[in-house]
Amino acid sequence: MIRSERGDQAYWDEWVEYAEERFQAVHDSLKTVAGDTSYEPQYLFNLAKGYWHQMLRRYSRGDAVSQIARYFPPLLDAWEEAERLGKSVWTETQQYSRHAWALNLDHYIVCFWLVGLALALNIPDDQWNRLLQLIGNEGEDALLDRVIASRQAGREIGTRLCHPQPYRRLLEAVNAPREKQGELLFTFVDNWYVELDRPAKKELSEKTAMYERPYWHRYGDQNFEGGAYFGRWCVEAVAAVKAFGIDDSLCQGHPNYPGDLLRPDGPGTHPLHSAQEGAGSGEVGEAEAAVKRSGWLVSCPSNSPAEPGEFFKD
């Protein structure tokens, strides 16, 4: 059963299979073709990004939750190699902007997603420890550090939220009396997508996020058939439920809540629906700009694997 409200069976089948083909093609090209090595770290990071998109894409299609965890090993391999090679390519400022939760909203959310997936899927300890090495940022966030600490004893907990909008609501749910947690969790999930559409910042500093909304926020609003859309899943809520034992019954069936991640053997939490192929409400040009920022619809030249491209059709 398709879990996403958007996209029919043909859409999800096409793009799940296309991604699998591209993964193999990218691995083959990395082994055989030489290119500008300065692009290789970003290219490898985009490969890692492709794996976490595929995890969520398969969830959206309705695949068995047990099939999702197999993407962690190649994801970690690609990300680790990107970081290794990037040390000689990225400047200190670039390294900071790529990794700092407070500055990089995209990185914060992706780390939250991967932690949530890792907890829900109970990945092995060796993979978990590799993931934590890549995530870093220990002691930087009052919420995500606590979630990670549910499986990493002794982790330093931050004293502030890197991104109060929308994550203050989730922290309130975590801190609430148990009888209030479920309702507050639902409030977070119900406002999560809208509140990530944040106003632009007038100036930048070390404490100011580079972008006002996540790179994927408008995926599907334009050129839905192009394949960038992989779902809009609040994995952060699943992470908190797994870490703190919050009652998620009010969230089950919400179009943004991936509750089946916590119930791999069923029953399913998503209602049957008439899937749309999805016209959206994004302003003209905004979705295209977000896609360019993420690299997901930029084709990689067949003779240059080191270009910072991605895997989907133009």
Where are these predicted regions, by residue range?
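Short linear sequence motifs
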Residues: 16, 160, 237, 304-305
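Charged/polar positions within long, soluble alpha-helices
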Residues: 119, 242-245, 310
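Eukaryote-skewed repeat-based solenoidal scaffolds used as protein-protein interaction platforms
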Residues: 2-220, 229
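Alpha-helical oligomerization segments
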Residues: 183-298
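N-terminal functional modules and adjacent low-complexity/disordered segments of proteins
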Residues: 139, 279, 292, 306-307
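Intrinsically disordered, low-complexity segments enriched in serine/proline and basic residues
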Residues: 294, 301-305, 309-311
